[in-house]
Amino acid sequence: MKMLVKQIYENAKELDKSKIKIKGWVVTSRGNKKIQFIELNDGSSVLHLQLVLKSEKMDLNDIHFKTGSSIKAEGILNYTPKAEQSVELIVDKISLLAQSDEDFPIQTKKTTLEFLRTIPHLRHRSNTIKAVMLVRSSISFFIHEYFQKNDFSLVAAPIITSNDGEGAGETFIVDSEDKEPFFGNNVKATLGVTGQLHAEAYALGLQKVYTFAPTFRAENSNTKKHAAEFWMVEPEVAFFTLKELIQMSEEMLKYVIKKVLEKRRDELVFLDTHIKPGLIQSLEDFLESNLEIIEYRKVIEILEKNKVFFEEQNIEFGMDLKTEHERFIAEKYAKGPVGVINYPKKLKAFYMYQNDDNETVAAFDLLVPGIGELVGGSQRENRYEKLEQRIQELNIDQKDIQWYLDLRKYGYSGSAGFGLGLERLVMYITGIDNIRDSIPFPRTPNNLKM
């Protein structure tokens, strides 16, 4: 029967002494005239399957497979759980599908992540990037599964839009080569920085919605946390309060992490061993944690008392927290995930609900050790006059988002939603510390390979 490596390891006991057919790529090859061992990987798992070739079954002089070559083999599966190699295939037939050139850049010696970034078309054939991308795939699946199980509707937010949802102005302009404006005169088309505004429109009718799409920021930042193109998960729920939103974000993260720990255990064990020791324990600790909620004002007090530990020591109310501050709160103060609420309104987007103090908004950031901000969300401003006033204060062109204001005229009693950067979550779950290694084809300043 045809099998994948992942299926073989998951069902090894039942498959013992079964005839198996498999296709994949050569990772290593070694041996002598009497016996040869080939490590094969087929992309379904970070684990390799050892193929055993014996001279009494075939002429080993004809077996010359270079690293990276694709092959097919069939034979009898041998399951020996107490042996160092618990599963191996005793090969009856083997053939070359496509030989790999000798200059295949991913060999058995350890390859740095920096080098792998120079070959984005091949780097997923390394163990590390393969493990990360398999985990990423499962994370995406379980995010969808969580929302679908909880009666959310997936909304396809547009990639091309006429408004800057965050109001930061860091957008990529979209146009054609024609002399005439493609979308008409006086229309500034950009790549979307968020699907939140469109999700909010659909929540006013479908109640529970989410978007899962690429977003774009023309932010000239060359840090480990920033990319020009990344994926955002943005749920929006009508009638929701900030408290309910925070509870949902914690529940969703725990659901996804628990499922990934079950589904991608082999990949996480590899990453725990080679990338971030203690990774699995930290994820299991997250599942057992209770999210602590703390006011932004309290955070400032804590940081002020500990400012000697920071590069940015100008601590005051109204400051935008740096990653070092966020990590300190999560790692040293809370010693786990923490939700920071009620940020100064000047730090947040125009659409957030203004608290009675007229100084803060009903917003939250969920901070986690090792990353800092993982999730950011808010209750939305449902009062037309308040929202209009805030738009004017920030000098946002009202005509571009009049439709968003108009939502408040037609039965809008409020909603709440958050944004989760998929790559940030991939980094947290895999232990990878650079966003460039959490996405298949990273787009960053001065970097547009492929």
UniProtKB/Swiss-Prot annotation:
GO cellular component, one term: cytoplasm
EC number: 6.1.1.22
Annotated GO MF terms: asparagine-tRNA ligase activity; ATP binding; nucleic acid binding
Location (main, coarse): cytoplasm
CDD domains xrefs: AsxRS_core (cd00776), EcAsnRS_like_N (cd04318)
Broadest EC class assigned to this enzyme: ligase
Reactions catalysed according to its record: tRNA(Asn) + L-asparagine + ATP = L-asparaginyl-tRNA(Asn) + AMP + diphosphate + H(+)
UniProt keyword Endoplasmic reticulum present: no
GO annotation, biological process: asparaginyl-tRNA aminoacylation
Subcellular localization(s) per the UniProt record: Cytoplasm
Top-rank taxon: Bacteria
Record keywords, A-Z: Aminoacyl-tRNA synthetase, ATP-binding, Cytoplasm, Ligase, Nucleotide-binding, Protein biosynthesis
InterPro entries linked: Aa-tRNA-synt_II, aa-tRNA-synth_II, aa-tRNA-synth_II/BPL/LPL, Asn-tRNA-ligase, Asp/Asn-tRNA-synth_IIb, NA-bd_OB-fold, NA-bd_OB_tRNA
Keyword flag Cytoplasm: yes
Subunit structure: Homodimer.
Family designation: Belongs to the class-II aminoacyl-tRNA synthetase family.
Protein name in the entry: Asparagine--tRNA ligase
